[in-house]
């Protein structure tokens, strides 16, 4: 099952995607996150409502303004989770890389964009990079969950583009220059396009057997299997829930493979279009514009 959010008369509405068409879910919930809060991963009632003809047809997917599937309370990201990505940056896999994942947070309240919405380059943007990533959406409250149990807490999966400013912005701090963190360089408005769907977990037999493909203006830049992750989806959930409680709708982005612009020198330019495809999750497409 593929869930999404779309814009209707200025309001974001929840929907169900079926064979190119979108059916409204507003009679069942206010939002996709609201639905997860109420029902967790037990979403079979949506399919039943559709089968019974109780969901109104909103329109064709291609004709709707698609927004990110949901707004998470927490957006947690993993850096350096593919060996080839570490090595392309000049590093080597070290013992510490396999002991614990490198987690960072970006504000979930930033202006996130959905499928076909613009990635906007502001005047300060200099070296803007793309990062195609598998994102995990939690379906249940999770605390101290083992990797073996983690699948039971996942609502589904979506596509995330961890757009990043690579210019080493420096600020003055106590008479000593200090480079700004991931929190800043990955948190510009419109960075982090997400979607187009929340594909429910029952449609993904193995999250470690998916291929991530990224094209920029028709040129393939990334192509790698999630088999190459250092930490699996379920291991990441186990690690994170040792320290914090994950809630329904929280998103974990699981890292990007090799092929990013910071190593190839091919950064995003106004006029580009970024297309990220992941098996069974669809394609997330965003144009790049200069504001």
Regions found by a protein language model. Give the residues of each.
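Short beta-strand segments
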Residues: 7, 77-78, 105, 129-139, ...
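N-terminal non-catalytic cap/leader segment that marks the start of a structured domain
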Residues: 1-101, 273-277
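Non-heme Fe(II) oxygenase catalytic core, chiefly the N-lobe of the double-stranded beta-helix
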Residues: 109-168
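A generic local secondary-structure boundary/capping motif
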Residues: 4, 65-67, 91-94, 119-128, ...
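Short beta-strand-to-turn element immediately C-terminal to the catalytic PLP-Schiff-base lysine
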Residues: 6, 16-18, 25, 105, ...
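Catalytic-pocket segment enriched in acidic/His residues
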Residues: 8-9, 45-50, 59-65, 69, ...
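Structural signature of FAD isoalloxazine-binding scaffolds in flavoprotein oxidoreductases
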Residues: 94-113, 130, 270-280
